[in-house]
Regions:
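PLP-dependent amino-acid enzyme catalytic core
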Residues: 1-405
Length: 405
């Protein structure tokens, strides 16, 4: 059965409506002002399962025979495909076994179980989990649903592009995140069928750039290691079946750092009131790397499944990167009242103290200075400089040190 054709994309678009929301584009005034383009967000984080993956999973399962479904389904996933398959299998009344890396966030594990799937935790990264899933499929006769290297799955994911064109026919650029490449395959292939002149840009984390490495080599390439906070895109080897489609239809690949993802998370929370997981943020971080102006750009936000502990850590790191939280070290005479004097100086500058570390061990005698490390909240870089200047004027010889929260 030939996939990734216009007929199949249209068929898939109708099929996935049974289980998905048609997520409406969100125009971003903030990102448009920041980049000089007309930026729209495709919020797949608003799907029932919290990510786009249910599109490919549901369409793939719809193409299976009844006998293939009843044997039971198995897949490997860092989280979102797991939930997609679990939910789709539940809709079809099939058994689902999901192999997930041991590093998978707890929220994704629990949500997958909530759809009735059996979860097996195995390996540190997706590739190890996938190898184990294939072993279980061989041993138990399960039907394997690949998370990205499957043309039917990619066709289902590509239905996102159909919705984008329906709502914004004159779209000029689409930014799509890349893990293994299934979403990029579907979106870029359909986008080029609908408008050969459109530019489709893939975005990967710099620490998991398997597709960029494969592009450069002209063949599927395996990375020795992956290291990124974007767990859903931490893939060593892209799909071999889909790679020719990506070579043909993807115009470029941009990589973004983990630091850029952290700042993008803060931007989405503060300016759009949206929770977007780290793996869904590359297309936001990549906007500043586009060397174009006044273009209609759509960034696909692929998911929003993020546990609260990770969320808290990312917010704090983002505030540090934006100079909204910082730590300063000052030396004080070791005598009563000095702490009150420093506090008064900070209060006058509206610095909000959130942590104090008073270290007497740096002094050599009772008359020498002791170190005080102060972690503060402020309004940004200018306010931070204002506080430092006030401390200098008061004679405290402040020194910026690493913030540990």
């Amino acid at each position: 059965m030939k996939m990734l054709t216009l007929d199949k994309f249209e068929e898939a678009s109708e099929k996935v409506k049974e289980v998905t929301l048609e997520t409406k584009l969100v125009y971003s005034d903030y990102l448009s002002d920041q980049t000089g383009n007309k930026v729209y967000l495709k919020p797949e984080n608003m799907q029932f399962t919290g990510a786009y993956k249910v599109r490919g999973a549901y369409y793939k399962i719809s193409t299976l025979s009844e006998e293939e479904r009843q044997r039971g389904l198995i897949t490997a996933s860092a989280g979102n495909h797991a939930q997609g398959v679990a939910y789709a299998a539940k809709c079809y009344g099939c058994k689902a076994v999901i192999v997930m890396p041991t590093t998978t966030p707890l929220i994704k594990v629990n949500r997958t179980k909530s759809y009735g799937a059996e979860v097996v935790l195995y390996g540190d990264v997706y590739d190890e989990a996938c190898a184990h899933a294939l072993e279980l499929a061989e041993k138990n006769g399960y039907t394997f649903i690949h998370p990205f290297d499957d043309l039917a799955v990619a066709t289902g994911q590509g239905t996102i592009a159909m919705e984008i064109f329906k709502e914004l026919p004159l779209v000029e650029y689409i930014l799509v995140p890349i893990g293994g490449g299934g979403l990029a395959t579907g979106v870029s292939t359909l986008a080029k069928l609908l408008n050969p002149k459109i530019k489709v840009i893939g975005v990967e984390p710099a620490g998991a750039n398997c597709m960029q490495a494969s592009f450069a080599a002209g063949k599927v390439t395996t990375l020795p290691t992956v290291n990124t906070i974007a767990d859903g895109t931490a893939v060593k080897t892209p799909g071999s079946k889909i790679f020719p489609y990506i070579q043909k239809n993807l115009d470029d690949i941009i990589t973004v750092t983990d630091d850029e993802l952290i700042v993008s998370f803060l931007d989405m929370v503060e300016n759009h009131k949206m929770i977007v997981e780290n793996s869904g943020l590359p297309t936001v971080a990549a906007l500043k790397h586009l060397n174009v102006k006044d273009k209609r750009v759509v960034s696909i936000l692929s998911g929003g499944n993020m546990d609260v502990i990770t969320m808290s850590s990312v917010v704090q790191q983002g505030l540090i990167f934006r100079d909204r939280i910082f730590t300063v070290s000052v030396l004080l005479p070791d005598k009563p009242g000095e702490l009150a004097k420093v506090s008064e100086t900070l209060a006058k500058e509206q610095g909000n103290v959130i942590k104090l570390e008073h270290n007497q061990f740096v002094s050599t005698n009772r008359n020498a200075a002791v170190e005080l490390r102060i972690t503060l909240e402020c309004f940004g870089t200018d306010h931070k400089k204002q506080i430092i200047k006030a401390l200098e004027k008061a004679g405290y010889k402040p020194k910026i040190v690493r913030t540990m929260i």
